[in-house]
Amino acid sequence: AAAGDVILEDVPGSVNLFNTLQDQITKVTAHVQDLTQKVRSSIYNTDKGLSFLELKDQLLLFYLQDLTHLMLEKTNGKSIKGNPGILRLVELRTVLEKMRPIDQKLKYQIDKLVKAAVTGSLGENDPLRFKPNPQNLMSKLSEPDERESDSGEEGAEGGVAKKPQSKVKRYIPPRLAPVHYDDTEAEREHRIVERAKKLALSSSTIRELKEQYSDAPEEIREGRAYHMMRHDKEEQHRINHEESMMVRLNMTRKEKARKKRVLSMTSQLNSLTHFSDISALTGGEGRAEDMVPFMKKSKKGPKKSKKKKGFSRRRH
């Protein structure tokens, strides 16, 4: 009796569901017939479609067919136990679930293609609108040469027949005239002051003040000078490069002089009372040339001609 009451309560809902289902089936059937007619009349071109969407449509169609078959069996009061349609539904559902991540990745491209097919143009904010124009990559060699045209006109005036111009022209590189760099005195002083500030920030005095007043943990180093540590680092890098590339690097005259100067600094005691110049950071006044040490001034003047002295013959 209780089971009969449950069935009677479900009857009105089932009837409404069947009526709604019948209306939906009628609309879907009309829509599918309309699309089929347009495809057969070549209104919609489906030759170059996406195989992924075609596979998805076929799987959904098979899924609906098996589901409809099982609903028909249950409506007729038959048992669906052991029905092969259940295994097919599980398999199709698994494949459709596995295809969902691929569908999400292709969603942007599919929407863009559909929008371009409907509107006939890309969107205003589409990144492909800002791609390079291939027409700008056309060779300029096919353009008429001005010099050849001028020479052709002069030949025509002189009575000489003008030769037909060939399509392939000779490439003429543009002529670039050297321009002198005008460096004012203010710009030169500003550049020297900036260099002095950079050297002052990397000096040992600023580094020691930073270590003294900084809250960071103190870094314990070997008791060696900073210039020696830098020299050892460069030398180790040089050795590693020579060993890895199996080649010997030749030192220039400038590098040899710098190495000799660095090695000689360790044996000199004259620099004990020499502190780094940080006047560029404190706003000290003075010439810009005095702020940057070790600046060699080039001497401009007439070069003396070197003439070999030979022995003069003495006549007897």
Swiss-Prot record:
Record's compositionally biased regions (Acidic residues): 145-156
Biological-process GO terms, alphabetical: maturation of SSU-rRNA from tricistronic rRNA transcript (SSU-rRNA, 5.8S rRNA, LSU-rRNA); regulation of translation; ribosomal small subunit biogenesis
Keyword Hydrolase on entry: no
Annotated Gene Ontology cellular component terms: axon; chromosome, centromeric region; cytoplasm; dendrite; filopodium; nucleolus; small-subunit processome
Keyword Signal belongs to the record: no
Coiled coil regions, renumbered to chain: none
Main location: nucleus
Subcellular location: Nucleus; Nucleus, Nucleolus; Chromosome, Centromere; Cytoplasm
Highest taxon above the source species: Eukaryota
Positions of the UniProt region annotated as Disordered: 124-169, 292-316
Matches recorded under PANTHER family: NEUROGUIDIN, SOMETHING ABOUT SILENCING PROTEIN 10-RELATED
Main function: Part of the small subunit (SSU) processome, first precursor of the small eukaryotic ribosomal subunit. During the assembly of the SSU processome in the nucleolus, many ribosome biogenesis factors, an RNA chaperone and ribosomal proteins associate with the nascent pre-rRNA and work in concert to generate RNA folding, modifications, rearrangements and cleavage as well as targeted degradation of pre-ribosomal RNA by the RNA exosome. Its dissociation from the complex determines the transition from state pre-A1 to state pre-A1*. May inhibit mRNA translation.
Subunit structure: Part of the small subunit (SSU) processome, composed of more than 70 proteins and the RNA chaperone small nucleolar RNA (snoRNA) U3.
Name the record gives this protein: Neuroguidin-B
Gene name of the record: ngdn-b
